[in-house]
Regions:
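N-terminal transmembrane alpha-helices
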Residues: 8-40, 44-45, 59-73, 78, ...
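Transmembrane helical elements of multi-pass membrane transporters/channels
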Residues: 19-38, 140, 174, 203-207, ...
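Helix-terminus/linker motif at the lipid-water interface of multi-pass membrane proteins
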Residues: 29, 33-52, 121-128, 184-191, ...
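Small-residue-rich hydrophobic transmembrane alpha-helices
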Residues: 51-111, 148-167, 273-331, 335-337, ...
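Hydrophobic transmembrane alpha-helices of multi-pass small-molecule transporters
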Residues: 63-66, 178-182, 207-212, 283-286, ...
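Short runs within selected transmembrane alpha-helices of multi-pass transporters and secretion channels
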Residues: 72, 141-159, 167-175, 196-209, ...
Length: 445
């Protein structure tokens, strides 16, 4: 690992932030492609019921993945903090404790997804024609949850060390395996949604093995001993940072699952169209998401080094970068959204339903650039309780109520339901601006 490249406390902010962010963005793009391939192949070679099953089931898998990623953010932030404070010897105990905690989380998720797979499909209000396939998809993915959790923990460790390239390699390996698996199992053996789920699990397993081999071969600035594998004080400190983020992400993703349930009530075509639109949405959110993840490490290092002015400047730099790209994404979705949805399915009705949702959602690509850069800044300061609180307020006061209200109107449409997302984000920006002013007034940042 090149120390000068992973030292964010000096040099050009843009010159350090962009090179660190790009591999994170690349990994997120491949992760989105990873999920999109399932829909693309099932949409082309499977059935409409299979497409709906993958759409609904992947929402559940996204919830698990995003929550684990945010939980692991505590590990990323604390590793970066120790590096900024020039105390890398503390990292071994942190990672050992994190392995214990994430192993326990994996066991719980495994049991829930295997035993309650059908109940999950019903709660998601999967169309009755697709309940069985959705249940199978969730169960198969649940069987491989250990690999999904392990991948996210390993990626968090590398990002905390200032290395964002290795996670890109991990997910690239998984993406290739998943594409091959989908083509063989779905297109070749006509296994529909089940084939897509098996390919997903196999790809994650290979990726984790590759990541472990890479980790053991490299020279690290710390050692991990047997006594480190316990819930120690370093681990508890990381949990204090990561737990609020995980809870906030869980409730946010639950709100999107509720949104999926609202849409499923509008019929099979709306369900499939929404699922296709969500894959495009995932791609559109990659820039702000990569900014948020990189911002946390960048800010945390500078906080550890006592350089608050540079940390705040990094936030505004991230906002500027995100806004430029967000505007481009907005125009692409508004004017070419039907072409984008048409990539995933040949069903004209499903294409139109997906485009309808994107029209309402489009503004989110712009406003999220602001919100996520601010959240990354607060995460880097360990202000994760606030990040959780503002997320809950957005979800409970704006996103869910507005989406539900739009879904029960006589003229309910996916466009109106889609607008709930940017409306909640705009409200969140206002909350965060007020909080930032409050902290400045109190001289706490």
């Amino acid at each position: 690992m090149n120390n000068s490249k992973s030292d964010f406390t000096q040099g050009s902010i843009l010159g350090k932030l962009i090179p660190f962010m790009m591999p994170i963005l690349g990994a997120l793009i491949l992760q989105a492609a990873y999920g999109a391939v399932d829909l693309l192949v099932v949409g082309r070679f499977g059935t409409t019921e299979g497409l709906s099953a993958v759409s609904t089931g992947s929402q559940v898998l996204n919830l698990v993945t995003f929550v684990v990623t945010q939980f692991a953010m505590g590990v990323t932030v604390l590793i970066a903090r120790y590096i900024g404070e020039k105390r890398p010897e503390q990292i071994g105990a942190l990672i050992g404790g994190a392995i214990v905690v994430f192993a326990m989380i994996s066991v719980v998720l495994f049991v829930v997804m295997i035993v309650l797979s059908r109940q999950i499909a019903v709660i998601m209000q999967a169309p009755k024609e697709a309940v069985g396939l959705t249940s199978v998809y969730v169960k198969i993915c649940g069987s491989g949850i250990f690999f999904i959790v392990a991948y996210n923990l390993l990626s968090a460790i590398f990002r905390g060390l200032g290395d964002s390239k290795s996670p890109l390699i991990f997910v690239a390996v998984a993406c290739v395996i998943n594409i091959v698996g989908d083509l063989v199992l779905v297109a070749g053996f006509n296994m529909n949604a089940s084939g897509a789920a098996i390919a997903t699990v196999a790809a994650q397993a290979v990726s984790v093995i590759f990541a472990l081999v890479l980790l053991f071969k490299r020279k690290l600035p710390f050692k991990i001993t047997k006594k480190d594998f316990s819930i120690n004080r370093h681990c508890r400190r990381a949990l204090k940072v990561g737990l609020p983020l995980a809870l906030q992400e869980f409730l946010t993703q639950v709100s999107f699952l509720a949104l999926c349930a609202f849409v499923n009530r509008l019929g099979l075509q709306a369900s499939s169209g929404y699922g296709v639109a969500c894959k495009i949405v995932n791609f559109a959110m990659l820039i702000p998401s990569s900014l948020m993840q990189s911002m946390a490490s960048f800010v945390s290092q500078n906080v550890g080094a006592g350089n608050e002015k540079r940390a705040k400047k990094a936030m505004f730099t991230g906002i500027g970068v995100g806004l430029v790209i967000g505007c481009i994404a907005f125009l692409l979705i508004i004017f070419k959204g039907d072409i984008l949805t048409g990539i995933f399915t040949t069903d004209a009705a499903v294409v139109q339903k997906g485009y309808d949702y994107l029209k309402g959602f489009a503004l989110e690509t712009i406003v999220t650039a602001i919100l996520f850069s601010m959240i990354g800044y607060f995460n880097g300061h360990d202000k994760t309780i606030w990040v959780m609180a503002q997320g809950l307020i957005q979800t409970l006061l704006v996103r869910l109520p507005l989406a539900y209200y739009m879904s029960i109107q006589p003229d309910a449409s996916l466009t109106k339901i889609g607008f709930a997302a940017p409306a909640a984000t705009i409200f969140g920006i206002l909350l965060n601006v007020v909080y930032l002013i409050f902290l400045k007034y109190k001289k706490r940042i």
